[in-house]
Amino acid sequence: VRLRTWQAKLLAPGDPTRRRSRVLAERDPSQLPWSELGVDVVMECTGLFASKEKASAHLAAGARKVIISAPGGKDVDATVVYGVNHDVLKATDTVISNASCTTNCLAPLVKPLHDHIGVLGGLMTTIHAYTNDQVLTDVYHTDLRRARSATQSMILTKTGAAAAVGLVLPELDGKLDGFAIRVLTINVSLVDLTF
């Protein structure tokens, strides 16, 4: 089933320039009009195109660079947490990952600890707001954790955030592990690290 591309124009109230912003919805990023619009950088925040191969569809559509707002794995040009390893960026990078929100919390916490004390290993727990891949009411699911209502349950689940720190700080690769407790808030999370 192919859905049609949806387009609209948005005019922000009170905008003195009276500029209209195009709003687009397209299941296949390679069909977006990035070339026509002169787009330099796409922020890929759907969670559906979180690898270099998949995010490159934006490049095929005419964007010059893509920043994935999720862990991108080892195939992206770089995984970057600003303030921790942003110096690894190169002008030739076309698809980079900004890791996850939890990795962006954990990496700045663990870097100075490792630099000044040394981290041999650690366990991280994140108390995390629920996310859009969770169900809002109890439903059937083969993974019982995924069957519970995000709006009424505290749900223990896995997270790749601790492992993703190894992509940002290679000297810690394989030394951190962690889990998440998804809680009934739509925003705000915290990280607890034992090392």
Stretches with model-predicted labels:
Residues 116, 121-125, 134-195:
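C-terminal substrate-binding/catalytic lobe of Rossmann-fold NAD(P)-dependent dehydrogenases
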Residues 1-135, 139-147:
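N-terminal Rossmann-like NAD(P) cofactor-binding subdomain of oxidoreductases
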